[in-house]
Amino acid sequence: MNKLRTNYLISYLKKVVLFVVVLALTVCLTGCEEQDELVLRVYSWEDYIDDGTDDNGIKIGNSVMEDFEEWYFEKYGVKVIVEYDTFATNEVMMNTLKTGKTSYDLICPSDYTIQKMIGNSPEENMLEEFDYTLRDQNGDLIIDNYKYLSPYLRNLFEEKGWDKYSIPYMWGTLGLIYNPEVVDHEDAKHWNILWDEKYKNQATAKDSVRDTYVIGVMEVYYDELMELREKYLNNEISQKEYSAHVQEIMNRCDDPNDPTEPGGTLEKIERALKDMKNNLYGFEVDNGKSDIVTGKIAINFAWSGDAVYSLDTAEYDNEEEPVYLYYSVPEEGSNVWFDGWVMPKGANKKLAQSFVNYLCSPEMAVRNMSFIGYTSGIIGDEVLDMINEWYGVLPYYYEDEEDPESTGWYFDGEILDIDYSADAEPKIIPNSNGENLYDIYINDTLIEEEVECYEVSLNHYFENADQEILDSIKPRYLKDGKVTVYVWERDRQFDTQYPSMEVLARCAIMEDFGIQNNAVMDMWENVKIGDIPFSITILVLGLLTLCLGALYTKRFMKARQKAKRRKIIE
């Protein structure tokens, strides 16, 4: 009997051990499956990354997401699927997150929304921190390409403390696109052109309180801003002091120290924007960038990325009659804006940071800039090559694997009949016959003489950059040790994408309205609705009186009819 019990116990224990082993293997295999296939959920703006399609939406190659999936598998041996969703506004994105129905690893909001997501306390913070020291299993830094971020942009983020929670993706300015055949260049240097009756019904502004608020605050504090500009240009204040003053003015939402103006800043801006509205063709969300190309309007208040689109389209889509539009950041000042990558709480940090690192490579930055027309915060030799190919006068080498006859050195859009390898070095030398005249060489061969072009410093984007980046810059982009390019023209596409330090000094980040948000929104609704004329008020009251009178008469007649019927019945 004891033997039977012992055998039963041994059999039972074997089954238990087998069950535990199977369970452990199942868990391990499940874990391996999860490790072998990761999902990265990304939420960003529409048309804000190279999706592998042409201008007609036809698939012509891999998207950036597909290439990242391949790169990640080659590097780590793990399959990744990138699920890429898009939103139209920051507010739509925030509402989606609040529902809690969908979670994301990576989101690309605008600067003021990043500020909202960080919040004012740990309890309000919606974001994970980036770990710039995190390394992968190979010992490589996960966010190694952060070194390519322009120190200018990096400093702006670090000053706000945003660098812990966000890495810039694209950035730009707000300004005015204008047609010089209709608009005087001098007039376009100031925001008050939008109030100028000379251009009545020829300009549009954004149907966005945040963007159009910039115009209002710049107009209201015109004198103060121009005085600051004068001090900066006369070296009475530093660039940092100047930018700080502009920042403070741009973010004014009230003015309690001014007893002569009821309501302070908001009251002044409301009056100014109402006057401006009466002079505009109208407010728009996205049509303005096309309307200025077709000639429907002559001035469009725009983001710099949309400005590049408009300038390119007007110039190149109508070869018979090209229109050469310009872009201006008015002298009073403007907004410098950013869209940056953030990781919501609970994100797969390692995978999300790997994707951001991939996007921060100069190669990917150039690729995405080429696709969407906006400006990346990434710098490097590849970016300088792109700038020169798009806007510069120096010859560049182009290699076409599919068409060897198209491979070679190009100047001013034409292939050169010279037998130099890609290692040859272009040079530019001032010509003594006039200002802005230069002679162009490749090695010692003269390519063109007396070329009219402009020398432009880009050193403010590279100053204090990683030494590895500075050492990689080709000699053709350096003058006296400073990063310099030579471009065909000014105040058009090149300056739209890469403003000078003088322009950037008068641009500031617009912060969240905070506790004044409702007051600002009320002000904006008042601007859009406008003041109702007295004659309209009388007309509305008259119609209301007639309607009420008719309603009363109808009810009175019904009551009399009922009374008559009761008498008849009785």
Task: Give residue ranges: language-model regions.
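Early extracytoplasmic/lumenal segment of secretory-pathway proteins
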Residues: 34-120, 141
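Alpha-helical transmembrane segments
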Residues: 544-558
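Extracytoplasmic ligand-binding site segments that recognize negatively charged/polar headgroups
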Residues: 43-61, 110-296, 310-313
